[in-house]
C-alpha cells in the first residue's frame, strides 16, 4: 500500500480514457473490474470505505493539492454552482451551513467549513466509516432535497470543488467526528 502515498492529495482528477473525474472509489472499482475480474463494490459500504480509508491513510499529513484547471475546469465550475445553489424544501445550499454558520452547533456537532481532507471519516453517531458522497447524500436529505446518486457526475463535481477548497490542508483521513 505504500505505493498509494500521495494519491489522496490529488483526487478527484481527470481520467483521460473516460473523460470523467476519477475519485478514489472509481479507482478502486476500476482495479477490481478491469484487473481482478471482480465485481465492483458499492460506493459507501464497508469494504469500499475500509479500502479507501487504508489508501487515504498513506497520504496522512501531506497537503491536499487538487487541480482545478484544464480538463477538470468544467467539472470544477459545476461543483461550485452546486455548492452555492439552494435546493430542497429548506432552500439551503452547502454554503449556508459551511460558510455562513461554520463553528456553530447543529444537533450535537460543530459545523465545519465543509472540508473533506478527513474523509472517509468514522462517525460516532452511526459507528461506521462514512464516505464523502455518503456525507453529501446525508446533507441533502437533511435539507429535504432529493440527493444525487453516489458516484454521479454531480457528486464527483461537488467533491472536486470541495476538495479544492481544502488545498494546502493536510490529509487527516481516516478521521473521527460525532
Locate each region found by the language model.
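Short Cys/His-rich "knuckle" micro-motifs
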Residues: 1-3, 104-108
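The canonical Cys-X-X-Cys-His
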Residues: 1, 51, 79, 89-101, ...
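Short, flexible, mixed-charge glycine/proline-rich loop motifs
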Residues: 84-88
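Short cysteine/histidine-rich metal-coordination sites, predominantly Zn2+-binding motifs
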Residues: 5-15, 110-118
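A short glycine/small-residue-enriched secondary-structure motif
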Residues: 1-8, 26-27
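Short acidic alpha-helical/loop segments enriched in Asp/Glu that coordinate divalent cations
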Residues: 66-68, 91-95, 107-111
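Post-cleavage N-terminal segment of exported redox proteins
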Residues: 12-77, 121-147, 155, 159-178
Amino acid at each position: 500500500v505504500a505505493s498509494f502515498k500521495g494519491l489522496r492529495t490529488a483526487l478527484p482528477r481527470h481520467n483521460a480514457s473516460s473523460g470523467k473525474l476519477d475519485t478514489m472509489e472509481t479507482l478502486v472499482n476500476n482495479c477490481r473490474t478491469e484487473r481482478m475480474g471482480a465485481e465492483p463494490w458499492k460506493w459507501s459500504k464497508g469494504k469500499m470505505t475500509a479500502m479507501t480509508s487504508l489508501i487515504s491513510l498513506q497520504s496522512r499529513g501531506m497537503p491536499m493539492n487538487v487541480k482545478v484547471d484544464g480538463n477538470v475546469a468544467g467539472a470544477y465550475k459545476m461543483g461550485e454552482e452546486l455548492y452555492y445553489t439552494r435546493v430542497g424544501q429548506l432552500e439551503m445550499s452547502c454554503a449556508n451551513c459551511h460558510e455562513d454558520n461554520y463553528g456553530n452547533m447543529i444537533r450535537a456537532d460543530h459545523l465545519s467549513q465543509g472540508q473533506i481532507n478527513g474523509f472517509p471519516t468514522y462517525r460516532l453517531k452511526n459507528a461506521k466509516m462514512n464516505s464523502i458522497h455518503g456525507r453529501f447524500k446525508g446533507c441533502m436529505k437533511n435539507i429535504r432535497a432529493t440527493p444525487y446518486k453516489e458516484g454521479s457526475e454531480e457528486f464527483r463535481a461537488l467533491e472536486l470543488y470541495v476538495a479544492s477548497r481544502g488545498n494546502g490542508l493536510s490529509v487527516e483521513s481516516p478521521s473521527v467526528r460525532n
